[in-house]
């Protein structure tokens, strides 16, 4: 049984949504589980796939607004970036709690929060990478994800507190 299936079986047997790119891993997944899942091409989401170098360097007109947000954030705040590790899980958890407390309730966000809590609880058993933005000792944004293969990294979650909207571009 896949890990995602174990998690979803706890949630009233809901079927998971799995985002996948083309390639070897998707072909492998279809070969193993294709009869149990539907596969849908989600064209509106295609613009959320970025080359690593593009996001690392933010070169060109396309990324001007991201550069502006980062500059504005840097002017307003003395901040640092910390890689996700056991020492900052509690800070990330506090940020998560504050973000969800400030967000109107809906079932999908409740499930999202449960997923984040599960991952933070099992962090040391999972191969996730991520980080957080710290301002004044407080986590104001966080992100984490997993490597799909050597060429693709999937950002699973990205949150920034409402008082720090530019932190989305920073994180």
Regions found by a protein language model. Give the residues of each.
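Acyltransferase donor/substrate-recognition loop-hinge adjacent to the catalytic core
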Residues: 34-105
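Conserved GNAT-fold acetyl-CoA-binding loop/helix
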Residues: 103-117
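Conserved GNAT acetyl-CoA-binding A-motif
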Residues: 11-23
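Structured helix-beta-strand junction loops
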Residues: 13, 76-77, 126
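Ser/Thr/Asn(+Pro)-rich, low-complexity disordered segments
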Residues: 1-5
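Short, charged/polar "capping" segments at the starts of alpha-helices
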Residues: 23-31
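A short helix-loop-beta-strand connector motif used in the catalytic cores of GNAT acetyltransferases and
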Residues: 121-131
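Aromatic (often tryptophan-rich) hydrophobic motifs at membrane interfaces
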Residues: 130-171
